[in-house]
């Protein structure tokens, strides 16, 4: 409780500019935490969906049944959407060569769109991570300048005279780091996780093409 009161006292005792800096950093930190939580939920769900879909799909013995079940849904995303579009192109194509070309083009578009969707909010986290320390530093420099400018009005200089002003100024730096560090960690984790997800999409597409090629060989052999 004492720490909370101490911080409030520091905020109220700071100059208007430093107070504005603190408010801006609080807003940036709060907003970035919302994006951090949202990214964690979205990307964790995407990885879970990949695992569950691949497990069910490759264990399924009836690819047509799986396609019909998924084709009725309107909210396919990730591997399910890639499979539905790929299978539609495979059924429409006259031969495997044409099917392969159409599937590659269609899935490339889908994967790019899904990557854009997964990356939503990353630019904000990157901005917060890079800008917040400098905003905090600006508040600190401004506060220190005010603290030392006040010394000119004092007849006797002591550490007690400048300590409160410097403390208020350093709070701005601490808030800048408080906003930047979690945003940077979340950004790096999100970029790495998205890369893993996209590679999973691309690997599934390649494996699916191999499966369709085997189907084509079987049909040709029967003829």
Label for each model-derived stretch:
Residues 10-13, 161-165:
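Periplasmic/extracellular loop-to-transmembrane helix junction in inner-membrane transport proteins
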Residues 21-31, 132-135, 139-142, 177:
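Residue-level signal for the membrane-embedded core of alpha-helical transmembrane segments
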Residues 46-159, 185-223:
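Predominantly long cytosolic amphipathic alpha-helical stalk/bundle segments
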Residues 169-183:
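Hydrophobic alpha-helical transmembrane segments of polytopic membrane proteins
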Residues 32-36, 179-190:
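Transmembrane alpha-helical segments in integral membrane proteins
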Residues 1-55:
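Hydrophobic membrane-targeting segments
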């Amino acid at each position: 409780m004492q720490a909370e009161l101490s911080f409030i006292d520091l905020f109220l005792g700071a100059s208007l500019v430093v107070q504005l800096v603190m408010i801006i950093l609080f807003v940036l930190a709060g907003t970035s935490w919302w994006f951090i939580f949202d990214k964690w939920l979205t990307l964790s769900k995407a990885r879970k969906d990949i695992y569950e879909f691949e497990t069910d799909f490759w264990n399924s013995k009836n690819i047509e049944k799986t396609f019909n079940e998924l084709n009725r849904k309107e909210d396919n995303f990730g591997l399910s959407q890639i499979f539905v579009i790929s299978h539609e192109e495979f059924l429409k194509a006259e031969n495997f060569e044409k099917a392969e070309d159409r599937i590659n083009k269609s899935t490339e578009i889908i994967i790019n769109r899904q990557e854009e969707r997964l990356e939503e909010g990353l630019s904000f986290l990157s901005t917060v991570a890079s800008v917040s320390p400098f905003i905090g530093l600006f508040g600190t420099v401004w506060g220190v300048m005010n603290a030392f400018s006040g010394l000119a009005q004092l007849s006797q200089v002591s550490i007690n005279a400048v300590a409160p002003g410097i403390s208020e100024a350093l709070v701005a730096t601490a808030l800048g780091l408080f906003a930047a560090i979690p945003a940077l960690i979340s950004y790096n984790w999100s970029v790495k996780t998205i890369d893993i997800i996209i590679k999973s999409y691309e690997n599934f597409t390649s494996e699916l093409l191999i499966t369709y090629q085997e189907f084509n060989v079987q049909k040709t052999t029967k003829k």
